[in-house]
């Protein structure tokens, strides 16, 4: 059942190219149905046993081993839900091709999060780059493909580093089928001579993917050039691949190297936190406000990942899902604004709230979650991370991290006020308010934002990431 979540979207995405180009509307809603069905299947697979198919025996053992325990379950649920919501809201030329690429992306990212073999993890890591690159090439609003190639070169560099580190680990240990072990148990430790090099390969890949300052320069223009539906999914889920890798791969496999790298990662995380918040404050492009705010938010999760504190790790799990929910919601609403007003520049917008109260209501909830309002999901993750950092003895880190968290209120309120409040923009025609279908596209994310804010325990308890599960059809190593 778990491999069905991976293979079905990929196969359906490829088969969609057999549909006539005139079937754009049907393709859109078929894509929504596939993503919604995958979300339902994910919920039904919460306690499914691991699945493993024997594969390589030389130069090391590698198996198609998949599991859906711990944080993997919540990330796949976030992925399928955000994809369904994003596709339901999309308005784009050549929707058949776009939906096909989005389903390919969903399948590849699902493969990444369910992989319990490190080599399979690395393969899906590179596979998920292809749909995003093709979307950037085909639908970028600019005349240049620079952002597409920058995205590909940066992330392929990280993917190559990950693949080399994975191959080295496999040759040294004899197997890459190691990610299914319970966190901290049953995993062979790599010697210090090779451990630092392998950790460096993993870290380069994960820092680029997240991204973390100063490896972030591919991200702002990529988010700006992606169609809103694609930006919603990439920001919500693909950016979590690096953080998931630190928690799920390096923490159990290379604990000594994780501990040794913590001071450096604290510095990178704090710089990203502050830099992202300050740059978000002065952006005129609404999508770049969200991009730089993501750089800040993800820096906070990086601090938690290297704290070694269970409360902070629980907060990291919550904030990974929380950021996915509100960032997807913001990009979807900004897409609805841009489709009406034909601009996303804050300086050219204003007064939309009075004319579009339903649209304003949607933006209000997701923006309040992003700035950390108590009772919504963002606050739950932040408070757990800060508490855990304090408990771990990193008091100075927690203290500095408070500053950009406060700045989040400033840039999110500026975003909301610039778009929804103030005098009407004189050169913008009056448009209809959000339709019931557009509200329905955001509603599941809003419900999840509230539920996670009220009770974050189901997600925070998933900090073990690789929950132990029986394996069906386990191959002999």
Residue spans for each PLM region:
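Hydrophobic alpha-helical membrane-insertion segments
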Residues: 32-46, 155-166, 366-369, 445-454
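Alpha-helical transmembrane segments
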Residues: 10, 31-40, 80-81, 103-107, ...
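Transmembrane helix-loop-helix hairpins at membrane boundaries of multipass inner-membrane proteins
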Residues: 1, 12-100, 175-184
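N-terminal signal-anchor/start-transfer transmembrane helix
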Residues: 4-24, 204, 211, 433
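Cytoplasmic/organellar membrane-interface segments at the starts of transmembrane helices
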Residues: 175, 182, 226, 356-358, ...
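Hydrophobic transmembrane alpha-helices and their helix-loop junctions in integral membrane proteins
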Residues: 85-91, 96, 107-119, 131-418
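Alpha-helical transmembrane segments and their helix-start/interface "positive-inside/aromatic belt" motifs
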Residues: 24-35, 146-156, 356-360, 436-441
